[in-house]
Design a protein with these regions (language model features):
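N-terminal intrinsically disordered, cationic/polar leader segments
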Residues: 1-111
Length: 111
């Protein structure tokens, strides 16, 4: 994937996440974006997605869990998949992580 395609795919991920949080009470969780990052802030933690254009990855860091996961685009699955071979998809992983960290989200679903 070239850099232009990478940036479009990242832009889509960030837009989907921002839309997902539009109806969420900001006292429960909110999203902030800037300079290639997207931060999900909740009472207990900060979850950060960052772009890594040189390696065409999205990196996810979850401070409260001490976790960092790198995701590559998998064209055959049309999804961002972790680079350690476990098959974790970015949105599914993030959904599971947010449920652990922010019980106030209830049945919240990522778009």
């Amino acid at each position: 994937m070239d850099e232009k395609e990478y940036r479009l795919k990242v832009k889509d991920v960030y837009a989907r996440l921002e839309r997902s949080f539009e109806g969420v009470d900001p006292d429960v969780a909110e999203v902030e974006t800037g300079l290639g990052t997207l931060a999900i802030l909740s009472g207990r933690s900060k979850t950060i997605l960052s772009t890594q254009p040189s390696v065409r990855q999205i990196w996810l860091a979850v401070a409260a869990l001490g976790v960092a996961v790198h995701f590559d685009w998998d064209a055959s699955r049309q999804a961002w998949i972790d680079d350690k071979g476990t098959g974790k998809e970015l949105f599914a992983y993030l959904q599971e992580t947010l449920r652990q960290l922010c019980p106030g989200l209830g049945e919240f679903r990522l778009g």
